[in-house]
């Protein structure tokens, strides 16, 4: 038995909303599937979870660029050139995937030398 896809689509176009709803339910029951979008289900599951990893973004260097570079170098362990490039490229993430306490500690150190920082 060959399926004529175009004929099936034309038949579906002529069906009422109630008939289409019944068809979807029958297909779900027959094949053991769900018509729910998997993206929506994943989004709903993730919305209830508490965030445990944070990113620290240097949004503005402020007036004390040299001090900010030194702090970034201490925090990241990068070399002088890489730390300077990171600071010059602001807004940029200084650290990613850190705990809330560590993120707030980094933020405090950078703000102490005049930088503007966002924890995401």
Curated annotation (Swiss-Prot):
Gene3D superfamilies assigned to the protein according to its UniProt record, in alphabetical order: 3.30.1390.10, Single helix bin (1.20.5.710)
Presence of keyword Nucleotidyltransferase: no
Top-level taxon of the source organism: Bacteria
Keyword Ribonucleoprotein: yes
Gene Ontology BP term (one): translation
Keywords from the UniProt entry: Ribonucleoprotein, Ribosomal protein
Subunit and partners: Homodimer. Part of the ribosomal stalk of the 50S ribosomal subunit. Forms a multimeric L10(L12)X complex, where L10 forms an elongated spine to which 2 to 4 L12 dimers bind in a sequential fashion. Binds GTP-bound translation factors.
Similarity-based family: Belongs to the bacterial ribosomal protein bL12 family.
Protein name: Large ribosomal subunit protein bL12
Organism, as annotated: Lactobacillus gasseri (strain ATCC 33323 / DSM 20243 / BCRC 14619 / CIP 102991 / JCM 1131 / KCTC 3163 / NCIMB 11718 / NCTC 13722 / AM63)
Organismal lineage: Bacteria, Bacillati, Bacillota, Bacilli, Lactobacillales
Gene this protein is translated from: rplL
């Amino acid at each position: 038995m060959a399926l004529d896809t175009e004929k099936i689509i034309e038949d579906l176009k002529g069906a009422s909303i109630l008939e289409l709803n019944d068809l979807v339910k029958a297909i779900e029951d027959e094949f053991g599937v769900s018509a729910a979008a998997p993206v929506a289900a994943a989004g709903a599951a993730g919305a209830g979870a508490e965030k445990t990893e944070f990113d620290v973004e240097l949004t503005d260097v402020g007036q004390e660029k040299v001090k900010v570079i030194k702090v970034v170098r201490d925090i990241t362990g990068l070399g002088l050139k890489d730390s300077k490039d990171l600071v010059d490229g602001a807004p940029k993430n200084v650290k990613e995937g850190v705990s809330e306490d560590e993120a707030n500690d980094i933020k405090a150190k950078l703000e102490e030398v005049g930088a503007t920082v966002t924890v995401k």
